[in-house]
Amino acid sequence: MEKGMNVLHDFGIQSTHYLQVNYQNSQDWFILVSVIADLRNAFYVLFPIWFHLREAVGIKLLWVAVIGDWLNLVFKWILFGQRPYWWVLDTDYYSNTSAPLIKQFPVTCETGPGSPSGHAMGTAGVYYVMVTSTLSIFRGKKKPTYRFRCLNVMLWLGFWVVQLNVCLSRIYLAAHFPHQVVAGVLSGIAVAETFRHIQSIYNASLKKYFLITCFLFSFAIGFYLLLKWLGVDLLWTLEKAKRRCERPEWVHIDTTPFASLLKNLGTLFGLGLALNSSMYRESCKGKLSKWFPFRLSCIVASLVLLHLFDSLKPPSQIELIFYVLSFCKSAAVPLASVSLIPYCLAWVLGQPNKKTV
């Protein structure tokens, strides 16, 4: 088993080395792709846009992103995936020859296990939701036309171009091996396809959101404690990242498994609070919600406010405080874009109801 994994990892190292040597001029492009593919952009950019254009699509997009990333965390704890940037320095596979020289970048040194790729899984799931939802909107109940078939081909072609760029980016940056990004894409598509058949997320009560959030948190913590009791150190990757990363400032606490867990759960719970608030009912369910300029204003205001909000970084000196603030900050994202901003805009534009939450 170990010999087979070494061969697989060596193929990944050779792939990374080949890309870095032959596509040096594409360095900025691959870094940009990796930054754009970060799941944070699904919450801060794609979610508010889709929610105010097609509410159901926005809700599904957020659920797929959150549950997909939660499953990604569990998979990583089970699979113990290596990352190229530390494996090539730790392995004795190259004891009889020189190891390929692998370059590191500011976005290389993530601290969690490597398999499956979170960037690939998140991008695949989120973009799968957008493509299938767009096709469903344009098709309706009519028989597919020639224009629709062309749109279908163009969207799926664009989907796979995006996935290819994300996968190549993660390999180029030495953040993942090829098999990890492939596993991420397939897992993301599976999660998104599953949520195409789940209708209960669109009218879930606050109690349901609370219970699901508690279950996801309890399961993750319980699973972590169980593995720790069995003698498994689930924070083994943090030590490797700190030891093998070229620069200490490139190791970020917000890429640890628990940071990801609490950010996702905060986002999900925040969505539940927002959708079950009176501010949401009075603004997004009122007459103004059908007026396109109002929805467009909500999108623009959400993007501006969330961009400013994203620039606020919780202090990371004390991990517990960092995790709590990360949860609260993430919960505020859907609260702002779903209820607070539409309510304020509706109030400014003369919406008759002026009750608070």
UniProtKB/Swiss-Prot annotation:
It catalyses: D-glucose 6-phosphate + H2O = D-glucose + phosphate. Substrate binds at R83, R170. GO terms for molecular function: glucose-6-phosphatase activity; phosphate ion binding; phosphotransferase activity, alcohol group as acceptor. Pathway: Carbohydrate biosynthesis; gluconeogenesis. Its EC number is 3.1.3.9. One of its GO terms (biological process) is urate metabolic process. Keywords: Endoplasmic reticulum, Gluconeogenesis, Glycoprotein, Hydrolase, Membrane, Transmembrane, Transmembrane helix. The chain crosses the membrane at residues 29-49, 61-81, 118-138, 148-168, 171-191, 210-230, 255-275, 292-312, 321-341. GO terms for cellular component: endoplasmic reticulum membrane; membrane. A motif (Prevents secretion from ER) lies at residues 354-357. Residues 1-28, 82-117, 169-170, 231-254, 313-320 are lumenal. Belongs to the glucose-6-phosphatase family. This is Glucose-6-phosphatase catalytic subunit 1. The gene is G6PC1.
